[in-house]
Amino acid sequence: MEGAGGKPTAVVAVVTEPRFTQRYREYLEKHKLLDRQHRVKKLRDGTVALPVLREALLEQHLRELRNRVAPGSTCVPTQLLDPVPSKKAQSYSPAQRLCLEVSRWVEGRGVTWSAKLEADLPRSWQRHGDLLLLSEDCFQAKQWRHLEPELWETVASALGAQRLAKRGRVSPDSTRTPAVSLLLGDHGWVEHVDNGIRYKFDVTQCMFSFGNITEKLRVASLPCVGEVLVDLYAGIGYFTLPFLVHAEAAFVHACEWNPHAVVALRNNLELNGVADRCQIHFGDNRKLKLSNVADRVNLGLIPSSEEGWPIACRVLKQDAGGILHIHQNVESFPGKTLQPPGSSEMEEHWPSPHQIISNQLNNGATSDSRRKTLSVATKPEWQRWAKAAETRIATLLHQVHGKRWKTQILHIQPVKSYAPHVDHIVLDLECRPCHLVG
């Protein structure tokens, strides 16, 4: 996401201890991974965040930093909100150029330029290759309508794009279809590369979350060799693909009911050479016929995936159990009473990338995330929600399988922040039949 002046509202960074900063910087510069548009930032816990180029960063780079470049270092991908531009970047402002070129063009059409029109120019946008996706809160004044469609050619030229689209509100339907209109160009298909994985999709039909990059990197490092995974909310393959390509899951059952996302998912599986290890289940996952197949289940739906919990319990292997990766938006307002899972007010929301969180076993978190070299940022609200979810899942497992199961919280991972006091987290929950754990 780019903001006014071309400054992203968040960038990906690699966090380590100060004594390893120079070694990290030299490695990142050598491999053309260092983001020179933003400053290195010292975090509150004393660690240092080095901004990196999101599309170029691979999981193998993180392994090299940990194991070869700086053995013993803590290497954690995270996001920096409102990063500080470097001195070089501060002299370059796409927003200023946009204002200058649009105002000149508007006045050349005989329309008076005003402070109202200037305030109505876009303050943020997403760049998808040659397509620029504008935010919904721009170009709302009536005067713009009389200047279309030539206006969009001027905007695209000023911002270095060939196609333009404008975001609306996400449809409240269950498929979360984005209300995006194409302003300039013949189609909305774009391609992104994250951690070496190619994602193609139509921005007018499918959503793409830039903020999930740290979770995609974490998923890519999970030990899934030989495992079967069920992804209950696959979308265009946000997590299905990292599980297949990097975590080396043996097979993935991908569930999705948005037909446009299914088209993109099928294409992305082919693009990345893993179509033979994935079966797409198109439709409502509550009608899924699978059971007793999964070593892991990914529940990547926010604000809550609770409707999918009974299905997740059913598809876990009856005799061996497995791991659930449960996404949730959790409110952390001071003094607010947390609603337990199963209540009518379960819909929660949330924000920012801290680092690590709790884990009590090895499974479900990388070795670096188990170290205490970075400050533990677990909020009490996250812990309370996780404990309530653990209890609820244990009850569901008993109901589904007719026998007692033991559940244990392995890890709580922050993904991103939406607003103050609203946190998107992932709970890694181990679920085993009691006869396996004594």
Curated annotation (Swiss-Prot):
> Where on this chain does S-adenosyl-L-methionine bind?
S209, K216, E256, D284, N285
Annotated InterPro entries: MeTrfase_TRM5/TYW2, SAM-dependent_MTases_sf, TRM5-TYW2-like_MTfase, TRM5/TYW2-like_N, TYW2_N
Q: Which reaction(s) does its UniProt entry say it catalyses?
A: 4-demethylwyosine(37) in tRNA(Phe) + S-adenosyl-L-methionine = 4-demethyl-7-[(3S)-3-amino-3-carboxypropyl]wyosine(37) in tRNA(Phe) + S-methyl-5'-thioadenosine + H(+)
A molecular function (GO) term = tRNA methyltransferase activity
- Annotated pathway, please? tRNA modification; wybutosine-tRNA(Phe) biosynthesis
The cellular component terms of Gene Ontology attached to this UniProt record, alphabetical and capped at eight, are: cytoplasm
What is this enzyme's class at the first EC digit?
transferase
Q: Which UniProt keywords apply?
A: S-adenosyl-L-methionine, Transferase, tRNA processing
Q: Which residues form a coiled coil?
A: none
UniProt KW Protein biosynthesis keyword: no
What are its E.C. numbers?
A: 2.5.1.114
Q: Which GO terms describe its biological process?
A: tRNA methylation; wybutosine biosynthetic process
Which family does the entry's similarity section mention?
Belongs to the class I-like SAM-binding methyltransferase superfamily. TRM5/TYW2 family.
> PANTHER family given for it?
TRNA METHYLTRANSFERASE (PTHR23245), TRNA WYBUTOSINE-SYNTHESIZING PROTEIN 2 HOMOLOG (PTHR23245:SF25)
Protein role: S-adenosyl-L-methionine-dependent transferase that acts as a component of the wybutosine biosynthesis pathway. Wybutosine is a hyper modified guanosine with a tricyclic base found at the 3'-position adjacent to the anticodon of eukaryotic phenylalanine tRNA.
Q: What is this protein called?
A: tRNA wybutosine-synthesizing protein 2 homolog
Q: Which organism is it from?
A: Bos taurus
Q: What is the lineage of its organism?
A: Eukaryota, Metazoa, Chordata, Craniata, Vertebrata
